[in-house]
Amino acid sequence: MSGLTHFDAQGAAHMVDVSDKEVTDRVAIARGAVRMAPETLAMIEGGRAKKGDVLAVARLAGIMGAKKTADLIPLCHPLPITKVALELVPDADLPGVRIEATVKTSGQTGVEMEALTAVSVAALTIYDMVKAVDKAMQLTDIRLAFKDGGKSGRFEAE
């Protein structure tokens, strides 16, 4: 476990000490999708979901999710997030909704988990809001697409 920073020499989990790390600007972009029946997508696009505006609520839920990441994932540091933006794009070819979250901070550790949490919570919210008509929806392809800043530098998924 020598390469895993969240474990000590005995293998016990611990929160990484970032106090000696330099404060730098950091950004992370995560992506994912919710696949659904074409009829479900049409209902969302037409604003006919009984629970309300699915995409607007999912966007807000994603923002809230990013802000609550340290409360949800035990070893994540609470961070001063400076930006959370979500794009939710209906895609008839999927069919479903594509989700992208961008999170920024200026701090001692990155915001990858916050971006991934934002996408995940937005996807879960879409599922929750229309599950009554489509229980077969799939939350899929949730992944880190890009990160920059900090000691490890830049990462771009292929």
Curated annotation (Swiss-Prot):
Pathway, per record? Cofactor biosynthesis; molybdopterin biosynthesis
GO BP terms in the entry? Mo-molybdopterin cofactor biosynthetic process
Catalytic activity annotation: (8S)-3',8-cyclo-7,8-dihydroguanosine 5'-triphosphate = cyclic pyranopterin phosphate + diphosphate
Indicate whether Lyase appears among the record's keywords: yes
EC no. given is 4.6.1.17
Catalytic residue positions: 128
InterPro entries found in the cross-reference section: MoaC, MoaC_bact/euk, MoaC_sf, MoCo_biosynth_MoaA/MoaC, Mopterin_CF_biosynth-C_dom
Listed Pfam families: MoaC
Residues where substrate binds: 75-77, 113-114
Molecular function terms from GO: cyclic pyranopterin monophosphate synthase activity
* Name of the protein described by the UniProt record: Cyclic pyranopterin monophosphate synthase
Organism from which the protein derives: Dinoroseobacter shibae (strain DSM 16493 / NCIMB 14021 / DFL 12)
